[in-house]
């Protein structure tokens, strides 16, 4: 959630007045910041979410400092104990965050020094907040990706499970939102499994690229201390240290790539949500959503509103906005670090929360929805949906060129339209008046079920294909129906 607008006359704003400069960096300053400077500069209101990653990074850094001789074993033990106590304080809600200390890094470091004294002040040796925050942020995004991957897999399992259940359930396939050809409901659901699989691949790729450790890059140029960057990288489960200190502390392409992947995934969820909204409407009547994912109206007692689906549909605007916002922040920044980069976290936190909610809501809707199969079957045969099957029959059985078959079928559709009937209701004589070679075998391909059964090409909607694909996905995802 975005911070409320700052009231420069409020107690919060004036709380900075008269304070000394930040004790972590204020040695060369004679006085503290202006009230509004304190407000705009502080990020603790949102970056405190990084506390677990910050403590984990500090523990790895401290262990490395002790190994290379920059901390004693006693100091390391004190730091570990102090950071453990601070983690407990934060976890239990007892930690008092100070906006005057700006961010989560300074808040934890100041509290550590308060608890254990000199050893706490040694922790920041060979480290800058620049490489510290870059490390924390990569750890946080990596953790977020892992969580979203699990959620996405769960949604894919739900879709594949329902697809297997409805492998042979006819429904209309649309182009231009006009009935085009029959498909199965299972085939339609599996289309989203494929999309989500690619979304998982993009997140997996983003995770692989971000998995390098900035710690040890210091402010921008590295450090003169004899540190072991590979030790800290390994301790934090990174693949390797970053190769260039300037790049490590200044770029946020890993966050942008993450937001880009989320934007694409949100687009896919938005498409599915839109279809759920349509399918649940009275004119379609394809599905009924459970009470758990619908709401009522304050004035119209009969209403059953698909609010969960509508909110998922809308989240794309928020997530894509976060992506474009951060892209705009980063586009003109010279090397190396600039305070602009503080604006990197809120978009990522916001987009992650939006995606987490969207996946959970969509998973629940898919599991709980009821398919109105009779209605789906009725609409699947509307709009001359088997016309393509007729054209294919002319090509296959009578060796008519496809363009000629297309023309003949179009004339037969026009004839049926004029009579107000389906293609299958035309008599053989009427069909032969357009194409004399047509025989009674044509009627075998004009049913919805025959159309579905014939689509046996790889990736097609034949029920046997759909059943096989659904079972294959469930096996890949580690669950059988």
Curated annotation (Swiss-Prot):
Composition-biased stretches (Polar residues): 1-17
Region annotated Disordered, chain positions: 1-25
Subcellular location: Cytoplasm
GO CC entries: cytosol
Record keywords: Amino-acid biosynthesis, Arginine biosynthesis, Cytoplasm, Lyase
EC numbers: 4.3.2.1
Catalytic activity line of the entry: 2-(N(omega)-L-arginino)succinate = fumarate + L-arginine
GO biological process, one term: arginine biosynthetic process via ornithine
Pathway the protein contributes to: Amino-acid biosynthesis; L-arginine biosynthesis; L-arginine from L-ornithine and carbamoyl phosphate: step 3/3
UniProt xrefs under Pfam families: ASL_C2, Lyase_1
Domain of life: Bacteria
MF GO annotations: argininosuccinate lyase activity
Family matches, as PANTHER family: ARGININOSUCCINATE LYASE
Protein family per UniProt: Belongs to the lyase 1 family. Argininosuccinate lyase subfamily.
UniProt-recorded name of the protein: Argininosuccinate lyase
């Amino acid at each position: 959630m975005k911070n409320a607008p700052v009231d420069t006359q409020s107690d919060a704003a004036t709380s900075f007045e008269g304070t000394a400069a930040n004790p972590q960096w204020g040695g060369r300053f004679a006085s503290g910041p202006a009230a509004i400077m304190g407000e705009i500069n502080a990020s603790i209101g949102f970056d405190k979410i990084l506390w677990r990653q910050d403590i984990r990074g500090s523990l790895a850094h401290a262990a490395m400092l002790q190994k290379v001789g920059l901390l004693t074993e006693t100091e390391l033990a004190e730091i570990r104990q102090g950071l453990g106590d601070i983690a407990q304080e934060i976890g239990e809600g007892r930690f008092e965050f100070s906006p005057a200390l700006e961010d989560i890094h300074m808040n934890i470091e100041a509290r550590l020094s308060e608890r254990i004294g000199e050893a706490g002040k040694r922790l920041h040796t060979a480290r800058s907040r620049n490489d510290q925050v870059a490390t924390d942020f990569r750890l946080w995004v990596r953790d977020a990706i892992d969580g979203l991957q699990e959620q996405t897999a769960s949604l894919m399992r739900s879709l594949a499970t329902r697809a297997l259940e409805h492998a042979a359930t006819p429904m209309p396939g649309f182009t231009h939102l006009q009935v085009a050809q029959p498909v199965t409901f299972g085939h339609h659901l599996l289309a989203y499994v494929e999309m989500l699989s690619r979304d998982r691949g993009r997140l997996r790729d983003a995770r692989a690229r971000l998995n390098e450790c900035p710690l040890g890059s210091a402010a921008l140029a590295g450090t003169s201390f004899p540190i072991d960057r590979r030790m800290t990288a390994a301790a934090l489960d990174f693949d390797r240290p970053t190769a260039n200190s300037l790049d490590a502390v200044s770029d946020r392409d890993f966050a942008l790539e993450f937001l880009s992947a989320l934007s694409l995934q949100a687009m896919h969820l938005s498409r599915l949500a839109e279809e759920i909204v349509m399918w649940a409407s009275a004119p379609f009547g394809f599905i009924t959503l459970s009470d758990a994912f619908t709401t009522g109206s304050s004035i119209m007692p009969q209403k059953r509103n698909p609010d969960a689906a509508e909110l998922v549909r809308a989240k794309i605007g928020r997530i894509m906005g976060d992506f474009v916002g951060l892209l705009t922040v980063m586009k003109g920044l010279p090397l190396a670090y600039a305070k602009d980069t503080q604006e990197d976290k809120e978009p990522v936190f916001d987009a992650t929360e939006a995606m987490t909610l969207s996946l959970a809501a969509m998973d629940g809707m898919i599991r709980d929805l009821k398919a109105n199969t009779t209605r789906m079957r009725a609409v699947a045969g509307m709009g001359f949906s088997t016309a393509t099957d007729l054209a294919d029959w002319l090509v296959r059985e009578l060796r008519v060129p496809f363009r000629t078959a297309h023309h003949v079928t179009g004339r037969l559709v026009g004839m049926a339209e004029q009579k107000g009937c389906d293609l299958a209701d035309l008599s053989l004589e009427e069909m032969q008046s357009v194409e004399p070679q047509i025989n009674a075998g044509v009627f075998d391909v004009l049913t919805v079920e025959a159309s579905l059964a014939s689509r046996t090409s790889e990736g097609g909607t034949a029920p046997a294909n759909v059943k096989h694909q659904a079972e294959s996905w469930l096996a890949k995802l580690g669950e059988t129906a």
